[in-house]
Amino acid sequence: MTYLLVFLGGGLGAMFRHFINTVSGRMLGTAFPYHTFFINVSGSLVMGLIAGYFAFKGGSSQHVRLFLMTGILGGYTTFSAFSLDAALLYERGAVGLAALYVLGSVALAIAGLFAGLALIRAIT
């Protein structure tokens, strides 16, 4: 049942993401990645709202959390999970580890992308 909830939520999140990509491209153009910027910021905002609500106003079932946070937000943007992880490290007092996580994730993700591009260029 949990996999089905994540699957269904992920599909909805991906549809929302595609909608934002399409609309922002038409409205703002494609010279700057407004769509990704908006998705990352809005997804992180919603993750904060949901996580904060569950933490401060009372929990909810694991099924609801999986559907909303892992499913919908995971399909919409994984940046929200990244932001939550960084915030949790910071709030636990692991400021240095949070900074390392943020800088390392961004730098290694970009390096990984360039490595993938270089590899595919080399073999094609």
Swiss-Prot record:
It is a multi-pass membrane protein. It holds the Pfam family CRCB. It catalyses: fluoride(in) = fluoride(out). One of its GO terms (biological process) is cellular detoxification of fluoride. GO terms for cellular component: plasma membrane. Na(+) binds at G74, T77. GO terms for molecular function: fluoride channel activity; metal ion binding. InterPro entries: FluC. Fluoride-specific ion channel. Important for reducing fluoride concentration in the cell, thus reducing its toxicity. HAMAP family: FluC. This is Fluoride-specific ion channel FluC. The gene is fluC.
